UniProtKB/Swiss-Prot annotation:
Gene: XOAT3
Biased segments, Low complexity type: 1-15
Function: Xylan acetyltransferase required for 2-O- and 3-O-monoacetylation of xylosyl residues in xylan. Catalyzes the 2-O-acetylation of xylan, followed by nonenzymatic acetyl migration to the O-3 position, resulting in products that are monoacetylated at both O-2 and O-3 positions.
Cellular component GO terms, alphabetical: Golgi apparatus; Golgi membrane
InterPro entries (UniProt xref): TBL, TBL_C, TBL_N
Keyword Transmembrane: yes
Similarity field: Belongs to the PC-esterase family. TBL subfamily.
Motif (DXXH motif): 418-421
UniProt xrefs under Pfam families: PC-Esterase, PMR5N
Taxonomic superkingdom: Eukaryota
The name this protein goes by in its record: Xylan O-acetyltransferase 3
GO BP term, pick one: xylan acetylation
Residues with glycosylation annotation: N82, N107, N146, N278, N348
Tissue spec: Highly expressed in leaves. Expressed in roots, stems and inflorescences.
Organism, as annotated: Oryza sativa subsp. japonica (Rice)
C-alpha cells in the first residue's frame, strides 16, 4: 500500500507535534565491505567445502557448528550502533502516567511500518491484505497527558537486546504484540539474517546479527491446562491446573526479558473448570469461581518467579487487560454490531469507558506485582488507552480456523467479527513503544551471550 496523500485529521483533537524521526545510523565499516567482496569470490565456496568436509569426517564433534548456517561464519555481527554519539534519549519522568492521555491523528510519522513490507505478519492480523477497505486506524499516535513517548528506534532497541532473549508468554494477544515487535525491528536486519522458527509452544524470531531472539511462548493461562497445544483446543472444554506451572516455566529460565499476559481466556464463564489435585485425568475437575482461580494461578506464578528468576539478569513485565469491543452502546452507538464498521477511535470522552472488564482481575495482578519481594514485576497498563480503540480490531478482516471469512460468514458479524485481536500496524505498536520506553528507562546488565534456542 503506497502512502496516502496527506489526509486531514478528524476535527476532534488538537494535534501535538509528531516525535522526531530516528537518527540515521552510522555507515557500515570498511571490514563489512571487504566481507561483501569475499562473499562474491571463490573463498566462499572454499569455506563451504571445508565446512561440509568437517561435518562428514567428524560428525558428532561438530554438532554445535552444524546448528549454525554457513552465513554465521561468513557474515559478522551487526556493527555496534554508536548510541552514545546520539542526542540523549528524552525519556518521560518516572512520575508520568503513560496510560492516561489521548489519541492524536498523525499521518506524518505513522504507520511505524507497512503491512506489506513485514513478511513475518500472519494472515490473522493483516487486515489490508484481507480486504479491509479503510486504513485510518494506522494513523493514531498515543499522547500521554503530561509527557511524551520517545519514538521507537529499532537500532537503539536491538543494541539493548544484543546477545539477549526476550519472551512474550501468554495468549494470542501477547502473540499479537510479539508480531508487532518483530515488524518494528526487522527493517534494520539484513536479508537472510532474520527468520522465524515455530516449534511446539514456541514462535522464535532470530536476529542473527545481534545474536538475539524475540520469542513468543503459548501459555494462555500461564499455568498448565488442557489448552496448552497452540493449535488444538476448544473454548468450552478449557480446564486448568492452578498449582502446576513447571512444564511451562522450565522454558522461561535464563530469559533476559519476560513479558506476561493472561485475561481473555478467562472471560467465557464466571466459573472455571479446575482439575482436582493429584488427578490423572482432565475429566476429573471442579468448577471454581473465576476470581478465586485467578488468585491461585498468580500465587503459583509469583512463587515460581521469586524462586527461579535472578532479578540482576531478568526483567519481568505484565501487560494489563486488552479490551473487547463487543457492545457498541457502551461508546454511544446503540445500533452498531460489535466493532464492525468502526473507523475512528473514541475521541470525545471525559471519563473512562465501561467495557465490562473484570477489574477484580486487574486489581489482583496489580497487588501481586506490588507485593513481590525479590523479583520486581513492572505492570504495563494498556487498558484505558486501548479501550478507546474500537476502530482498530481485525473485525471481519481476519481468519477463522485458518481461512478467511466467507461472504456468508461476513454477513453474520454478530457471530464472526473478531473484536479481540488487533490489525497490524496498529495499537500493539504503541504497547511496544511503552515497553521500549520502560526497558530503556532501566539499567540492565551487559550481555552474557547466552545459549539461544536451537534453530
Amino acid at each position: 500500500m503506497s502512502k496516502p496523500q496527506q489526509q486531514s485529521p478528524p476535527s476532534t483533537t488538537t494535534t501535538s507535534p509528531p516525535p522526531p524521526p530516528p537518527s540515521t545510523p552510522p555507515p557500515a565499516s570498511s571490514s563489512r565491505s571487504l566481507l561483501s567482496a569475499l562473499r562474491r569470490s571463490p573463498v566462499t565456496t572454499l569455506v563451504a567445502a571445508f565446512f561440509l568436509l568437517a561435518l562428514f569426517m567428524y560428525g558428532e564433534d561438530v554438532r554445535t557448528l552444524a546448528e549454525l548456517s554457513i552465513d554465521d561464519y561468513l557474515y559478522p555481527d551487526a556493527d555496534f550502533y554508536n548510541v552514545s554519539a546520539l542526542p540523549p534519549l528524552l525519556l518521560p519522568p518516572p512520575t508520568c502516567d503513560l496510560s492516561r492521555g489521548r489519541w492524536v491523528f498523525d499521518n506524518t510519522s505513522l504507520p511505524a511500518y507497512r503491512e506489506k513490507e513485514c513478511t513475518f505478519l500472519t494472515k490473522q492480523v493483516s487486515c489490508l491484505a484481507n480486504g479491509r477497505p479503510d486504513d485510518l486506524w494506522q494513523y493514531w499516535r498515543w499522547q500521554p497527558n503530561n509527557c511524551s513517548l520517545p519514538t521507537f528506534d529499532a537500532r537503539r532497541f536491538m543494541e539493548k537486546m544484543r546477545g539477549k532473549r526476550m519472551m512474550f508468554v501468554g495468549d494470542s494477544l501477547n502473540r499479537n504484540q510479539w508480531e508487532s515487535l518483530v515488524c518494528l525491528v526487522q527493517p534494520i536486519l539484513s536479508k537472510g539474517r532474520k527468520k522465524i522458527v515455530k516449534r511446539g509452544s514456541f514462535n522464535i524470531f532470530y536476529a542473527k546479527e545481534y545474536r538475539a531472539t524475540l520469542e513468543f511462548y503459548w501459555a494462555p493461562f500461564l499455568v498448565e491446562s488442557n489448552s496448552d497445544n497452540p493449535n488444538f483446543h476448544h473454548i468450552d472444554q478449557r480446564i486448568i491446573s492452578p498449582e502446576r506451572i513447571e512444564s511451562h516455566a522450565n522454558n522461561w529460565k535464563d530469559v533476559d526479558y519476560l513479558i506476561f499476559n493472561t485475561y481473555i481466556w478467562w472471560m467465557n464463564n464466571e466459573d472455571i473448570k479446575v482439575r482436582r489435585p493429584n488427578s490423572t485425568s482432565w475429566s476429573d475437575h471442579d468448577e471454581v469461581p473465576r476470581i478465586e482461580t485467578y488468585g491461585r494461578v498468580f500465587k503459583t506464578w509469583s512463587t515460581w518467579l521469586e524462586q527461579n528468576v535472578d532479578p540482576a539478569r531478568t526483567s519481568v513485565f505484565f501487560m494489563t487487560i486488552s479490551p473487547l469491543h463487543n457492545s457498541p452502546a457502551q461508546w454511544g452507538n446503540p445500533n452498531g454490531i460489535k466493532c464492525v464498521k468502526e473507523t475512528l477511535p473514541v475521541l470525545n470522552y471525559t471519563k473512562p469507558l465501561d467495557l465490562n472488564h473484570d477489574m477484580r482481575m486487574y486489581d489482583l495482578v496489580a497487588k501481586v506485582a506490588k507485593n513481590m519481594k525479590n523479583v520486581p514485576v513492572s505492570l504495563i497498563d494498556i487498558t484505558r488507552m486501548s479501550d478507546y480503540r474500537k476502530d482498530a480490531h481485525t473485525s471481519l478482516y481476519s481468519i477463522r480456523q485458518g481461512k478467511l471469512l466467507t461472504p456468508e460468514q461476513k454477513a453474520d458479524p454478530q457471530k464472526y467479527a473478531d473484536c479481540i485481536h488487533w490489525c497490524l500496524p496498529g495499537v500493539p505498536d504503541v504497547w511496544n513503544q511503552i515497553l521500549y520506553t520502560r526497558i530503556l528507562s532501566k539499567s540492565s546488565p551487559p550481555s552474557t551471550h547466552p545459549s539461544l534456542p536451537p534453530q
